[in-house]
Amino acid sequence: MQTLTASEARANLYRLMDQTAESHQPITISGKRHDAVLLAAEDWQAI
């Protein structure tokens, strides 16, 4: 799973959304206090 900082994710949000939707691979976004996961809506609905 790819991991990016929050700043990197913010700078590339639209590209990351496309990448996640096309590859069906989640992306971890690491922050100072917490981490989050960017996941395609289609994959989220399948959970």
Task: Write out the residue ranges for each language-model feature.
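Structural signal for short hydrophobic segments within the conserved structured cores
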Residues: Q2-L4
